[in-house]
């Protein structure tokens, strides 16, 4: 079932209904949310494919955001590919994709951590902020029992 959804998403036949692909992204995101690693892999690979329309890429970002939101209260080590993918999207050629990925990433920092990122800046100006996002990611995705693990404050 998951493989079939992946086929629907990756099928770039322009005659295919975009809404069918959109819905496949949505359903696959539901599976990915519950640690279905094959579903996560399909989504994280597809969202980086710049040949997809913004419409589909936004739905793919929404799909991985569900998994990311479940990761926020706990350790992010096991699903670190989701965070790494969102950070890669900060350097995407599409400013809308960069901005949406940034909105999702900020949720993991309680909207505090912007790290100076502005999706409208040019590639060179974005690099310092992306390095700060990568530094943050290396801390929050550290294995739970490692020396690098940062304990999150209780609310």
Which role fits each region the language model picked out?
Residues 1-10, 34-48, 70-89, 112-118:
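Amphipathic alpha-helical scaffolding segments comprising HEAT/armadillo-like alpha-solenoid repeats
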Residues 2, 21, 39-40, 57, ...:
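Short amphipathic alpha-helical segments that mediate assembly, nucleic-acid/protein binding
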């Amino acid at each position: 079932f998951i493989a079939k959804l992946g086929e629907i998403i990756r099928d770039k036949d322009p005659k295919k209904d975009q809404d069918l692909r959109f819905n496949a992204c949505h359903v696959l995101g539901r599976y990915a949310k519950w640690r279905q690693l094959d579903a996560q892999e399909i989504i994280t690979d597809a969202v980086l494919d710049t040949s997809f329309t913004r419409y589909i890429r936004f739905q793919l970002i929404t799909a991985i955001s569900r998994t990311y939101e479940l990761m926020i209260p706990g350790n992010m080590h096991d699903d670190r590919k989701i965070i790494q993918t969102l950070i890669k999207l900060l350097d995407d050629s599409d400013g809308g994709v960069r901005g949406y990925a940034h909105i999702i990433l900020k949720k993991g920092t309680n909207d505090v951590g912007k790290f100076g990122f502005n999706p409208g800046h040019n590639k060179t100006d974005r690099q310092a902020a992306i390095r700060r996002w990568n530094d943050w990611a290396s801390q929050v995705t550290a294995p739970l029992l490692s020396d690098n693990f940062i304990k999150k404050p209780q609310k």
